């Protein structure tokens, strides 16, 4: 491993270009990426290869990849400070996945809960790529030797596998790979569905009413909040027995910056008929700058392509050095 004791710690994260990025993605992840750019050497990837583990329409995948990258920038990721790139633009990801496949026991992958859950939904359509998804994820991470990987609770098991693969490689071939630490945040990490306060807001939820997409028009945001599941109890408070109420208050608290206590005091005597329009106004104004920046980025010919081209070059340089070291340790003859 290179000696980087004086360099800023490196952090890596990314999102699949499936569906649209929503408020839960922003509050749980992207907002933290933006605020931490000055602190870390940051790499942010659009993981399009992971999207292929389930059937995709080619034209929509290309459009969604561009949209996701543009949203990274619109949300405040600064390409002068951070490396923004598309996973498939760096070929080292797939090569290292194969090398790690030759190192990873099958029973490690058979324990992955997410594969079991998705395999049930897909039935006979499930492919090897979905089974191997965690190994590709390990390659994504270890190529850039990050010190920290922001991860939600639903990805904790996959990162543990990444750490196991790194340790196994180091045990077999000598200390070569940094074993990354998890960065798990509690606040804002679980914004819930607007239709079910016990389920996480998700891009894959079949109901578009369940989420507030970052690019939703103002009138659509207002309608979704108006139709969000709630209860008839007067007085709003954070209460596990009232998950939908808690979720809507959480969104308000995270966007307003007020403390939970202040939010409860403000709406102690309110019902949802009063609260929902206030929340809608807050969400609309909060997301307005993101939508405006997105429109500007999408309308500037060649800008996004240039950012992704430069990002791929920077990412390839770092990933190539790691891959070269791994190939050497594993005994592969270098190309002439």
Curated annotation (Swiss-Prot):
Reactions the enzyme catalyzes: tRNA(Trp) + L-tryptophan + ATP = L-tryptophyl-tRNA(Trp) + AMP + diphosphate + H(+)
PANTHER family in alphabetical order: TRYPTOPHAN--TRNA LIGASE, MITOCHONDRIAL
Location of the protein in the cell: Cytoplasm
Subunit note: Homodimer.
Keywords, ordered alphabetically: Aminoacyl-tRNA synthetase, ATP-binding, Cytoplasm, Ligase, Nucleotide-binding, Protein biosynthesis
Role, per record: Catalyzes the attachment of tryptophan to tRNA(Trp).
Binding site for L-tryptophan: 140
Chain ranges for the short sequence motif 'KMSKS' region as given in the UniProt record: 200-204
Positions occupied by motif 'HIGH' region: 17-25
Predominant location: cytoplasm
Keyword Cell wall biogenesis/degradation on entry: no
GO annotation, biological process: tryptophanyl-tRNA aminoacylation
Protein name: Tryptophan--tRNA ligase
EC number: 6.1.1.2
Gene3D superfamilies with a match to the protein in the record: HUPs (3.40.50.620), Tyrosyl-Transfer RNA Synthetase (1.10.240.10)
Pfam families: tRNA-synt_1b
Family under the similarity heading: Belongs to the class-I aminoacyl-tRNA synthetase family.
Keyword Transferase: no
